[in-house]
Amino acid sequence: MRVGGQLASKPATMVDDAAAVLVEDDADDPGYASRGGWKLDGALDRLGGPEIEGRLCLDAGASTGGFTDVLLRRGARAVTCVDVGYGLLDWRLRTDDRVTVIDRTNVRLMQPTDLPYAPEVIVADLSFISLRLVLPALVACAAEGADLLPMVKPQFEVGKEAVGAGGVVRDPEQRAEAVRRIAAAAYDLGWGTRGVAASPLPGPSGNVEFFLWLRRGAGAPDPVRIGQVVEAGHDG
């Protein structure tokens, strides 16, 4: 949308009553089911992997299905969507033959027998819980050679004293420590770090979020590299 010839991307933008309003149709806009789609899509490009085409996937904390949308568009063979809520998944995705919906299920308590297959790619977008509490359930369900891409939300990984106004973690070192903790927790479970990338979009409150690319047997996380990625994300 352009108002008076200028791009207007925020609802609170102040405009002149007489300014011309133009809504443009962007043919290149993929129109993902939610904002999360752009986050995962951008992270996969930045990480250079993992391969999605032809693989069985799990979307943990699927919500409306932004991540699921990306997986399907990248050629996933099937996607199982697990969420503690009910009826949240976008109807277009819910009615896709490749999608299995498992609602009213706490990912932390999920068992391999709850799923129709052992997922080869697992993506996770979870809130109000530390990933350290969820990783054991995710890795227990994973297929041999699986790739795991959790989105780290620092506000749920650091102590309350590190969370500022509006629920935002503003200290880059606290953000880096949040990512390091999740990478270390995964390594303790036998899953090393293949890559780390900042999300191309912030969370709703402005928190900078990060994706880890984890695989069983991969190398130990590099705390220096994590710090560099976090600092780059902080700098925009």
Give, region by region, the residue ranges found by the protein language model.
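S4-like RNA-binding module at protein N-termini
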Residues: 1-50
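Conserved class I S-adenosyl-L-methionine
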Residues: 52-63
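Conserved S-adenosyl-L-methionine
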Residues: 55, 70-78
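Glycine-rich SAM-binding Motif I of class I
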Residues: 65-66, 87
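S-adenosyl-L-methionine
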Residues: 78-133
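A short glycine-rich, Lys/Arg-flanked "PGG" loop and its adjoining helix->strand segment in the class I
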Residues: 132-149
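Short, glycine-/aromatic-enriched active-site segment of Class I SAM-dependent methyltransferases
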Residues: 154-171
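Flexible, glycine-/basic-rich loop-and-beta segments that form/coincide
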Residues: 208, 213-236
